[in-house]
Amino acid sequence: TWARAAEEIAQGRRVYVVCPRIDASDEVADAEEEGVRPLASVEQVAAYLRSHPALAGVAIHELTGRTPSALKAQIMEDFSAGRAPLLVATTVIEVGVDVSEATLMVILDAQQFGLAQLHQLRGRVGRSSLPSLCIAMHRHELTDAGRARLQAFASTTDGFELAEADLRLRKEGDVLGAGQSGTA
């Protein structure tokens, strides 16, 4: 995966890496079980990628909801211009980001995201005629719902089909009450 990222960058393209957590302090109960790895965080993944041999010399930026607005603008400008062609981020990039040179997205611990989020994230790549790829990875054992969600995501890029799949998987919810699907 990281060699592929290096190939894209060598061709003048941009790469997103999306994580469900900002840093280790965001861990809730996902790493309490013995032997279960904590969910990927922007801070840890960026540090790992900066030391990865395939990405030697590649400028890597981090972007999260905690990043100050002025710095966010500079980070996105650097990413768009190719000065920092690899961006490790949370879902803060989900909407309002248009970088036509972005051709690869790696979503880590993809089971943590909903179908709509995954679809919005994938929409950040493939915004030009360049071939693009979105890789949704998971390192944890999947629940039946998580597996179904990722299978639906992998099966189509059609937003309407994904919305229908999401409705089938999560149901319509309790529109008059407080019951919801998912975890908080």
What positions do the PLM features span?
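C-terminal or mid-to-C-terminal helical accessory/interaction module adjacent to the motor/catalytic core
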Residues: P20-D23, S155-A184
